Regions:
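ATP/NTP-dependent adenylation/nucleotidyl-transfer catalytic domains that generate, transfer
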Residues: 1-14, 18-48, 52-55, 62-176
Length: 176
């Protein structure tokens, strides 16, 4: 079944018109609305919500907090974007879907790579070799053709700035 989330999100925008000037905030409403609908259906049908996020998205923070990572199980969460494409192709997913330009669909013309400032192949390689792997910045630039220090620093910054998205919210320790 296809459930249209736009009318639901529009109700939120009408309730808080002062916030509708922020495109990112509005896009996040769509993503969080989708999560609410997913859980509503899952609860009603005694099911679980499966995620579609990958390691590149998780590590760079390219997801909406309490939105597209609000899932019960994320079977491809440990795979880099390249690995997800390879898996999809090996399972016979049509090439037009495998090669489709990644987008969160938050607004017209939006693409993941434009927002990240790097293509996924570069992000995956930097994550695998430098962030998750043993190579220094210098060794990574020497290993990856066309990758420079600024691109590595961009990925490092994305990882650092999104740490809060990969952690439970802070809470005070219990009183002794």
């Amino acid at each position: 079944d296809v459930i249209e989330i736009q009318p639901i999100a529009e109700q939120i925008f009408e309730a808080v018109p002062s916030a509708t000037g922020d495109r990112m905030a509005m896009g996040n409403v769509y993503v969080r609305t989708r999560a609410v609908v997913n859980y509503f259906v899952a609860n009603a049908e005694d099911r679980v919500v499966l995620g579609t996020g990958n390691r590149a998205e998780a590590m760079t923070g390219y997801f909406t907090k309490y939105g597209d990572q609000a899932v019960d199980c994320n079977p491809i969460g440990g795979l880099y974007k390249q690995q997800v494409r390879q898996l999809a192709a090996s399972l016979g997913v049509p090439a037009d879907l495998v090669d489709q330009t990644p987008t969160a669909g938050m607004w017209d013309g939006q693409t993941d790579e434009a927002e990240l400032g790097l293509d996924y192949d570069t992000v995956d390689a930097i994550l695998a070799l430098h962030i998750d792997g043993p190579l220094s910045t210098t060794a990574t630039t020497r290993t990856l053709d066309g990758v420079d220090r600024s691109q590595i620093e961009r990925v490092e910054a994305l990882v650092a700035e999104s740490e809060h998205k990969r952690s439970m919210p802070p809470a005070p320790s219990p009183l002794a």
